[in-house]
Amino acid sequence: MFEEKNALRGTEIHRRERFDPGPELRALMAEGRMSVMESEESPGGRTGWLATGYEETRQVLGSDKFSAKLLFGGTAAGRIWPGFLNQYDPPEHTRLRRMVASAFTVRRMRDFRPRIEAVVKATLDDIEATGGPVDFVPRFAWPIATTVICDFLGIPRDDQAELSRVLHASRSERSGKRRVAAGNKYWTYMGQVAAKTRRDPGDDMFGAVVREHGDDITDAELLGVAAFVMGASGDQVARFLSAGAWLMVEHPEQFAVLRDDPDSVPDWLNEVARYLTSDEKTTPRIALEDVRIGDQLVKKGDAVTCSLLASNRHRFPDPEDRFDITREKPSHVTFGHGIHHCLGRPLAEMVFRTAIPALAHRFPTLRLAEPDREIKLGPPPFDVEALLLDW
């Protein structure tokens, strides 16, 4: 990770609690400059920088003068994981992303929407039948996220619960040994999915890639793409749904707008994405040549990390930085920017646009079951671990 090596030494670039960036990161945002940091992720003691401004972050992520690949391939133990799109540079990145993007067509998204609606309805039916109070993280966010993403990718329903469990354990288990064991199970299963898809491609995302580009994508790349897309998508969607439900009950006046005005859904989605920023920062980019970012000259070989959390708040500084779905044009970089922007964004947004309004209409009096009890959060990026709601 990056540690400060100048007067800002000791500053944490993670949020401290809930959705607040914390005073140290806010101070960097107020200064409006790139901060020098020391990189331990690459050899030779590279100079590292932290970008906290919205425009600076977009400039870094959208520039072809930075490399994602050098960070992984340029370390003593580093190597590129086949199929992991975030580790590639053009032209390899262009080739692989084009193949995967062919499965995210507008038509495929449109045809898949009824399945999302069915999953959401079944989940809400189950919650309503149980009666409150209900923990909406394991009963609402994770079931919808897991089922939708797995259905889209072609994971059989009978395998989805176990796959979700091992994927979550591979990231959240406090024991390193258990994390590794869960990760191995996850990779083994995804390898089986890739092999089966190669033999018999179905009517799903992986099947579409094999049918259209089977001769151009290697077995290792297919496995990597499968593991990468599943790993990146499930967590993101679950985080958005958990946080979206929490923000609904914390802001009843804006909950009412969402419930009564269908046209407010896109604004709600954009503001949740901006305010939540589930992935707080990017992996570092390595400068391929000297380049000026804002007022700062970044030299060839320097590493730049972009704080998505700070960049999303930079345009709306405190005290105006509050959750507000009526905000004008709440632009954000939560899904990244440039050639590495999130490929699954249309699917994630479709799930959110379907699930959150359905939740609001099914339970118009949704509220915290224990208003005085603090919401349980995990370690950074502070995922909502439990959200007990009633209606």
From Swiss-Prot:
<comment type="pathway">
    <text>Antibiotic biosynthesis; vancomycin biosynthesis.</text>
</comment>
<keyword id="KW-0479">Metal-binding</keyword>
<dbReference type="GO" id="GO:0005506">
    <property type="term" value="F:iron ion binding"/>
</dbReference>
<dbReference type="InterPro" id="IPR017972">
    <property type="entry name" value="Cyt_P450_CS"/>
</dbReference>
<feature type="region of interest" description="Disordered">
    <location>
        <begin position="1"/>
        <end position="22"/>
    </location>
</feature>
<keyword id="KW-0503">Monooxygenase</keyword>
<dbReference type="GO" id="GO:0004497">
    <property type="term" value="F:monooxygenase activity"/>
</dbReference>
<dbReference type="GO" id="GO:0033072">
    <property type="term" value="P:vancomycin biosynthetic process"/>
</dbReference>
<protein>
    <recommendedName>
        <fullName>Cytochrome P450 165A3</fullName>
        <ecNumber>1.14.-.-</ecNumber>
    </recommendedName>
</protein>
<dbReference type="InterPro" id="IPR002397">
    <property type="entry name" value="Cyt_P450_B"/>
</dbReference>
<dbReference type="Pfam" id="PF00067">
    <property type="entry name" value="p450"/>
</dbReference>
<dbReference type="GO" id="GO:0016705">
    <property type="term" value="F:oxidoreductase activity, acting on paired donors, with incorporation or reduction of molecular oxygen"/>
</dbReference>
<keyword id="KW-0560">Oxidoreductase</keyword>
<comment type="function">
    <text>Involved in the coupling of aromatic side chains of the heptapeptide of vancomycin.</text>
</comment>
<keyword id="KW-0349">Heme</keyword>
<dbReference type="GO" id="GO:0020037">
    <property type="term" value="F:heme binding"/>
</dbReference>
<feature type="binding site" description="axial binding residue">
    <location>
        <position position="342"/>
    </location>
    <ligand>
        <name>heme</name>
    </ligand>
</feature>
<dbReference type="InterPro" id="IPR001128">
    <property type="entry name" value="Cyt_P450"/>
</dbReference>
<keyword id="KW-0408">Iron</keyword>
<dbReference type="InterPro" id="IPR036396">
    <property type="entry name" value="Cyt_P450_sf"/>
</dbReference>
<comment type="similarity">
    <text>Belongs to the cytochrome P450 family.</text>
</comment>
